[in-house]
């Protein structure tokens, strides 16, 4: 079953499947200004990049409906502000780097 695309007069496009935002081969929402949102089964989700890309350059990473990124900040605003999240939990940059270092060390040991 393929998602159904709805295009609005203002140029916005939305893909739905079973009443939920859903698209596996691209963003499920595309705004006329170029902003894009990736959804799977109604949840913000993207494994190979940010799940939200705003036209101004702001990027936000989500996985299974939770803010999440393991290799850097999960939110990078156009003004340079950054926020770190793992599994929906906000961390300071220092906390994030500590968790990342611990994971890297565990990977080396195994």
PLM regions with names:
Residues 1-110:
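Glycine/tyrosine- and acidic-biased, solvent-exposed loop/turn segments at the edges of beta-strands
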């Amino acid at each position: 079953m393929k998602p159904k695309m709805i295009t609005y007069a203002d140029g916005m496009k939305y893909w739905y499947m079973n009443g939920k935002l859903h698209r596996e081969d691209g963003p499920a929402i595309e705004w006329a200004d170029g902003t894009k949102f990736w959804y799977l089964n109604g949840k913000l989700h993207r494994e190979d990049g940010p799940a939200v890309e705003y036209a101004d350059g702001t990027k936000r990473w989500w996985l299974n409906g939770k803010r999440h990124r393991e290799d850097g900040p999960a939110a990078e605003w156009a003004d340079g502000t950054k926020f770190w999240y793992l599994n929906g939990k906000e961390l300071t940059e220092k906390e994030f780097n500590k968790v990342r270092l611990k994971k890297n060390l565990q990977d080396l040991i195994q």
